[in-house]
Swiss-Prot record:
The keyword ATP-binding applies. Acts as a chaperone. The modification Phosphothreonine is found at residue 199. GO terms for molecular function: ATP binding; ATP-dependent protein folding chaperone; unfolded protein binding. The gene is dnaK. Belongs to the heat shock protein 70 family. InterPro entries: ATPase_NBD, Chaperone_DnaK, Heat_shock_70_CS, HSP70_C_sf, HSP70_peptide-bd_sf, Hsp_70_fam. This is Chaperone protein DnaK. Residues 606-640 are annotated as: Disordered.
Length: 640
């Protein structure tokens, strides 16, 4: 069995790790970076760029450069948070046929799992390049507060990328694994505050030493799947755009190119203000009007940035309060606070967390890498390479069904340890009712319609009977990934109906298979592209070398040789401009043949000249050779 890799599929950045010789290792990508921007670009010549290369060209290709797509995964187009995002991103968010939020690139609608799969493919390739072997299995992390649809959609993304997802693991739990694996004996309770690029999670986790085994038990989890560094960036973008509008009367929101430049500048300024008190945002030629070009120059202080985002930081403390309450612990019971996610580098965030918990957060956990490392540890546990770790995670939201009057009746309460199975008996609402619809919902609201609808199915052929008489047993079964199976059984007839809750990514198995094939086709296209570029480079090198040879040969080249080479070079120069691999290879062969006789002639002359020079040098060479020959003392013995 190959290695099971750990992937942190982040909103802003992604990271891949493995366990090697018992120690976790974060793998550097082809660019030499330990994290990869979760940015995907579709270029005009049909190439798909992922990571730094996509980020670099974002300003010139804003409509087809996708970022923060994880925020759309498993969401409906009409969700308020999606609607808010539409005006803030330069690319197009559209409604899929089933009402999901998808993106549109070059006139083609694409599902978020399909886009995320491109990032996962890059992570897979990074691991394969390092290991020198094929990778097919992975543990992928998700925000703890992801609902069932979002988890299923993440699993779909893995499948599209050609990965068998062995486990979906919560990000704070993964960070706790990374933190707690090397800690000594004894029990301690930690809070993992995870503020990433697009999501926020808080988990209260108990690490216990049970018979020499590290037991990680999640006591409670809470969060907000639409609160993260992207929101901090957007506050700054809004401020810069408003300042510019006040000064010039021009609204930059209508200019995707300007919006993309603003985004990059806002992110850069935010990062700089974590270590300095003031910075300047300077964007020359941001736009133009009838009076000429306009420049954006704004001095920004840390205090100003903090005033813009203070409410976002405070917003993160509400889930923290709830998680502590749900865990049955008090703040004084928390031994350590772990910060995860790039946004926790902001001094205001660190201060808010320290003030709330009454202690400084730990600084010995890398906020960008801890989650991927934890995923790799979980992968090693599943592979049997790590034996002394037991992980007890929880379901983040209450699961139930809609009952009479539109009430949400819970079957599995939030923060229940998973995997778990729970059954409850329900009955009919009307006399002689022969079918019931089981509507599965997820959330904390009492009214079913206010919660997330996960799916519905019918149990038919119930024998007619007075209301309340038939006994219908509904069973909820959550696996270790937090993914739900629901079944309903008529106890009188034994008739059963079940449903695996599918992602609201709305992707059927056929669609996923099609996307897998598309991804494979892309891989084939990428291979052909690399082959074409390689052939082109070879031919260009040959043209240059041949021209240099002809120049150096001067009169030694006959008129026929020169004519043949000139014709072959012209043909090669034409071929190298195109995309026809066969033509490029044919031109390479022709040019090699045309120039080979001249090259051989020159080589023979050089050899002859070299041999002549050696002969002219005669026996004096040995004496002049210097140090090496002088070491042979035997020479002196001839003179005895």
């Amino acid at each position: 069995m190959g290695k099971i890799i750990g992937i942190d599929l982040g909103t802003t950045n992604s990271c891949v790790s493995i366990l090697e010789g018992g120690a976790p290792k974060v793998i550097e990508n082809a660019e030499g970076d330990r994290t990869t921007p979760s940015i995907i670009a579709f270029t005009n010549d049909g190439e798909i760029l992922v990571g730094q290369s996509a980020k670099r060209q974002a300003v010139t290709n804003p409509h087809n450069t996708l970022f923060a797509v994880k925020r759309l995964i498993g969401r409906k187009f009409k969700d308020d948070v999606v609607q808010k995002d539409i005006s803030m991103v330069p690319y197009k968010i559209v409604a899929a046929d089933n009402g999901d939020a998808w993106v549109e690139v070059k006139g083609e609608k694409k599902a978020p799992p399909q886009i995320s799969a491109e990032v996962l493919k890059k992570m897979k390739k990074t691991a394969e390049d390092y290991l020198g072997e094929k990778v097919t299995e992975a543990v992928i992390t998700v925000p703890a507060y992801f609902n069932d649809s979002q988890r299923q959609a993440t699993k779909d993304a893995g499948k599209i990328a050609g990965l068998d997802v062995k486990r979906i693991i919560n990000e704070p739990t993964a960070a706790a694994l990374a933190y707690g694996l090397d800690k000594g004996k004894g029990d301690h309770t930690i809070a993992v505050y995870d503020l990433g690029g697009g999501t926020f999670d808080i988990s209260i986790i108990e690490i216990a030493d049970v018979d020499g085994e590290h037991q990680f038990e999640v006591l409670s989890t809470n969060g907000d799947t639409f609160l993260g560094g992207e929101d901090f960036d957007m506050r700054l973008i809004e401020f810069l755009a408003d300042s510019f509008k006040k000064d010039t009367g021009i609204d930059l929101h209508n200019d995707p190119l300007a919006l993309q430049r603003l985004k990059e500048a806002a992110e850069k300024a935010k990062i700089e203000l974590s270590s300095s008190q003031q910075t300047e945002v300077n964007l020359p030629y941001i736009t133009a009007d009838a009076t000429g070009p306009k420049h954006l120059v704004v001095k920004l202080t840390r205090a100003k940035l903090e005033s813009l985002v203070e409410d976002l930081v405070n917003k993160s403390l509400e889930p923290v309060k709830q998680a502590i309450k749900d865990s049955g612990k008090s703040i004084s019971d928390i031994d350590d606070v772990i910060l995860v996610g790039g946004q926790t580098r902001m001094p205001l965030v660190q201060k808010a967390v320290a003030d709330y918990f009454g202690k400084e957060p730990r600084k010995d956990v890398n906020p960008d890498e801890a989650v991927a490392i934890g995923a790799a540890i979980q992968g090693a546990v599943l592979a049997g390479d790590v034996k002394d770790v037991l992980l007890l995670d929880v379901t983040p939201l209450t699961l139930g069904i809609e009952t009479m009057g539109g009430v949400a009746t819970p079957l599995i309460e939030k923060n229940t340890t998973i995997p778990t199975k729970k059954s409850q008996v329900f009955s009919t609402a009307d006399d002689n009712q022969t079918a019931v619809t089981i509507h599965v919902v997820q959330g904390e609201r009492k009214q079913a319609s206010q919660n997330k609808s996960l799916g519905r199915f019918d149990l038919a052929d119930i024998p007619p009977a007075p209301r309340g008489m038939p006994q219908i047993e509904v069973t909820f079964d959550i696996d270790a990934n937090g993914i739900l199976n629901v079944s309903a059984k008529d106890k009188a007839t034994g008739k059963e109906q079940s449903i695996v809750i599918k992602a609201s990514s709305g992707l059927s198995d056929d669609e996923i298979q099609k996307m897998v094939k598309d991804a494979e086709a892309n891989a084939e296209a990428d291979r052909k592209f690399a082959e074409l570029v390689g052939a082109r480079n070879t031919l260009e090198g040959l043209i240059h070398a041949t021209q240099k040879t002809v120049k150096e040969a001067g009169d030694k080249a006959t008129a026929d040789e020169k004519a043949a080479i000139d014709a072959a070079v012209k043909e090669a120069e034409e071929a190298v401009k195109g995309d026809d691999l066969a033509r490029i290879e044919a031109a390479t062969t022709k040019l090699t043949e045309a120039s080979s006789s001249l090259a051989q002639k020159l080589y023979a002359e050089q050899q002859a000249a070299g041999a002549g020079a050696q002969q002219a040098d005669g026996t004096g060479k040995a004496a002049d050779d210097g140090v090496v020959d002088a070491e042979f003392e035997e020479v002196k013995e001839d003179n005895k």
